[in-house]
Regions:
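N-terminal signal peptide c-region/cleavage motif recognized by signal peptidases
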Residues: 14-16
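Lumenal/extracellular ectodomains and adaptor appendage modules
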Residues: 18-328
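Sec-dependent signal peptide recognition
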Residues: 2-8
Length: 328
């Protein structure tokens, strides 16, 4: 895959997760993604920004009989970390991302399926038995944990679901240590030989930092970013030119925001994706964005597009937004 990075035209440069529809089964141990050879994804039109994710699909039933399919749309994993910024659009534990969908123009009531994993083991039942909410990022969840009897807290510690609170002045407190995995499910009927359109939208949950960490060569994550986001030297150099103190790599007037889109689940349908179109919007001309792709073109002041035919979504999309701070 060709690497490339997109910068801000204002700085003189020429041209840095959520998921695909998939079929599913619900079995012992939770949601399982299944292969479907009877329905093909003809096209996918995906729009990614810091404010909104939109995706429109066209599906074709390749058979002469109606296909009844359980569709799943996996959302990004949610963790609770005191060391990284993570922005969640709402405090609604049942619809954190404000997800909505239509099937052939009609609204769909999707069912949310959630599981809590600690040390790779599904611990949903243990948490629910104790009345602990599954959303690890909410303060109400932490309050519920620390209201439990010590014996119950110790049970959760023993199975890896709780960790010590990271701040010294909170000695004796615990924080969630599990990962919440979520997917929206609904039953769909694909009419024999016909094409239907499916549309989703939601507000992404973004991770991030308070600085452009990749500029710091001693403690930064340059190598990781080069692999994950295809970060290139011209973007790094542009950010370095904005340093208010040349010897202080954290003095650049930028923050980071990270977006993950689960694209690989789209490989569960018959054949490849006929036409895949990706649009990434960096939000402001003063921002930068970096990610991996091929044949990208600039389509507007802040938008960039990639179009691929017979596309196989073997890996997910990782986007790095380098955001100019408003106070500079």
């Amino acid at each position: 895959m060709k690497t490339w990075a997109i910068g801000a035209m204002a700085l003189g440069l020429a041209l840095p997760a959520h998921g695909n529809d998939t079929t599913a089964t619900v079995g012992v141990g939770g949601l399982q993604f299944a292969q479907n050879e009877n329905v093909r994804m003809l096209s996918e039109d995906l729009y990614l920004s810091m404010d909104e994710v939109r995706v429109t699909y066209e599906f074709e039933n390749l058979t002469d009989t109606d296909q009844h399919v359980l569709i799943a749309f996996p959302m990004p994993d949610i963790e609770s970390s005191p060391y990284e910024m993570a922005g969640f659009p709402t405090d609604d534990p049942e619809n954190v991302f404000g997800f909505s969908t239509t099937f052939d123009g009609q609204p769909v009531e999707a069912e949310l399926h959630q599981s809590a994993f600690a040390l790779g083991v599904d611990r949903t039942k243990e948490l629910q038995k104790l009345g602990v909410p599954l959303a690890p990022h909410l303060l109400s969840t932490e309050d519920a944990i620390n209201a439990l009897p010590d014996a119950d807290q110790q049970v959760l510690v023993n199975i890896g679901a709780l960790g010590a609170h990271p701040y010294e002045d909170a000695s004796g407190y615990h924080s969630p240590a599990w990962t919440l995995k979520s997917a929206y499910l609904w039953d769909a009927v694909f009419p024999a030989g016909e094409i239907v359109e499916v549309h989703h939208r939601y507000t992404p949950g973004l991770g991030g930092t308070v600085a452009a960490t990749f500029v710091d060569t001693e403690y930064g994550q340059r190598a990781e970013y080069e692999e994950k986001y295809c970060l290139e030297d011209n973007l790094v150099a542009a950010v370095e030119r904005t340093l208010t103190s040349p010897d202080e790599p954290w003095s650049a007037p930028f923050t980071e925001a990270w977006l993950t889109y689960i694209l690989s689940s789209g490989a569960n349908w018959a054949h490849s994706i006929g036409t895949f179109r990706l649009t990434v919007d960096k939000g402001s001309e003063d921002n930068f964005v970096s990610f991996c792709g091929e044949g990208v073109t600039k389509t507007g002041p802040t938008t960039f597009e990639m179009v691929q035919e017979d596309f196989y979504p073997w890996q997910d999309i990782e986007v790095l937004f380098v955001v100019r701070r408003e106070d500079y």
